[in-house]
């Protein structure tokens, strides 16, 4: 099996390089050209040429424009990367008879209510990021290519830029922390996303009728405030030198942190379909968060990195 992986230097892409390696020959690309191949989603023509050159059986697109607030001032670039490039990849996948695996977001929904969103619920994004990601989903679906679209939320890893690492940095620097407590979702590790992806690829080899959209998150739900408390408590128990304890994290409403792009209050995603179709049991969100913090704080991890406040 030949796999073309785009966005291989991102949080999810980094883990995919590990999880996909046993499945076949992986061509892992970043947005920079390498050996005449391009993984730059801002250049759909170069992407198409790369697909035609590699001739993969599976295309895994882990690249996206994910700077949510910046997309409000750069909507055309967001549309190019999040919508037009996936559309072109889908066309090439259809022509080549390849599968396209693509990652999307809870931001395709408006965040209303308190019930977990199902795949059949009508999308209604409230910001540019969500709208462009939805356009990418729709283009893939309309292309007729065999595909898996995984919607996920609150992605983190022990490396890269994410909420988990930001909280550790701030807890080492600040005397107090204020974190929003009225946005609810499930922190989902890049490691889990990559492992589920590899499992799904094995499944579609046997059952090509599994093409479609699936929600992929860790089990359970929490607020950003409670999430931050677990991060800090776990790091403190591991011996990390912090100025803030978990009990010092103050819950505040979202209105106290206005952002260019509005955030959904309800980011819950119902992963029942994924579990039933692929025969999976998804771990509790706390398990992955504790593991990621322990990876950072263990000897040889990023403890010194955070001590120097370099994020």
State where each predicted segment sits.
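N-terminal Rossmann NAD(P)H-binding glycine-rich loop of SDR-like oxidoreductase domains
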Residues: 1-22
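SDR active-site strand-loop-helix element
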Residues: 6, 29, 62-63, 100-105, ...
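Rossmann-fold cofactor-recognition segment
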Residues: 30-45
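NAD(P)H-binding glycine-rich loop region in Rossmannoid oxidoreductase-like domains
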Residues: 41-81
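Catalytic helix-loop patch of NAD(P)-dependent Rossmann-fold dehydrogenases
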Residues: 73, 80, 85-88, 95, ...
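NAD(P)-dependent short-chain dehydrogenase/reductase
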Residues: 141-199
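Mid/C-terminal beta-alpha module of Rossmann-like enzyme folds, strongest
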Residues: 196-197, 203-258, 304, 308
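Amphipathic terminal alpha-helices
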Residues: 285-311
